[in-house]
C-alpha cells in the first residue's frame, strides 16, 4: 500500500487542528516563532481554522516554511568541567506551530508507517504500543529460554553516536519512496529535511548562526519516526549473519544461540562477522 491515493487530498479538518492545539503541553518550551504553547492551547478555538488552512497550503505547495527551519539550542550541562563545551548536551527548541502542523499531517503519515511495518518488526522505540520495557522483556526471556535449554549465547550490542544528526537526507527520501510514501506528502517531507539554521542561546544571548543539514532534526515531531524508517534496514546484515535483533531507537541488540559444545573461538568469529556486516 502507498499513501499516493490520498496524497492529493488529505482531509485536514479544523476539528483535527482544534484537537492538536487543545492537547499541547503548556510547559513545552517556546521556540523561535515566539508564541508560547500555553497561548496556542488557550486560543485553540480561534486558531483551528487558520492552522488547518495553513497545513493544507503547505501540503499543496510541498514547501515547509523557512521561518520554521530555525532552531534555538540550549546547552544542558551533563557532568565534569563546566567550561568544556563537550560536557553539554544541546536541547533543541523549535517553533510550536511547526510541531502543530507536523502532528496534523502526521495523522496520515504515522498510521501508514505502522500499518506497513515501516520501522521493522523489532523496533520498540517511538512505536505505538511498544516501549523499552517490552524490548527488555523480549531480550531477557529469549536469553533465559536458551540458557534453560543448555545453549550458549553470543551477544553484540551497538548504538549510533549522534544518530539523529547523521542521516543522509537524500538516502532517507529514497527509503521512504520504497516504503510507499509518494506524492504531496513526500514533497513536504523532502522540504522539511532541507537545510536549517540554529543558534545557541545562553541567558538571552545568541551565538552566530550555524547550519544544520542531513539530520532528522532534534526537537521535532517527525524526527523519531523518520529515524526509525531510516534505520529499519540495519537488521538486514544482522539476519544475514544468522543473528536475531531487537532495536530501541539507535540501540541495536544482536544475539544468536549456539550448542553448548561449540568452542568460544568459533562464537567470536560469528560475532566479528556480524559486526563486520553491520559496518560494511
Residue ranges and their predicted role:
Residues 1-87, 99-100, 152:
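Surface-exposed loop/turn segments and immediately adjacent short secondary-structure elements
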Residues 14-22, 50-57, 107-109, 135-146, ...:
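Inter-domain linker/hinge segments that demarcate the starts of reverse transcriptase
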Residues 17, 31, 51, 73, ...:
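Mobile genetic element proteins and their domesticated derivatives, centered on retroelements
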Residues 27-35, 73, 83-93, 133-177:
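Conserved catalytic palm subdomain of right-hand nucleotidyl-transferase polymerases, strongest
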Residues 31, 70-73, 89, 123, ...:
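Catalytic palm active-site di-aspartate
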Residues 38, 56, 90, 103, ...:
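Catalytic-core region of right-hand nucleic acid polymerases
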Residues 105-123, 148, 224-261:
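Active-site palm subdomain of RNA-directed nucleic acid polymerases
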Residues 162-179, 253-280:
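Catalytic palm subdomain of template-directed nucleic-acid polymerases
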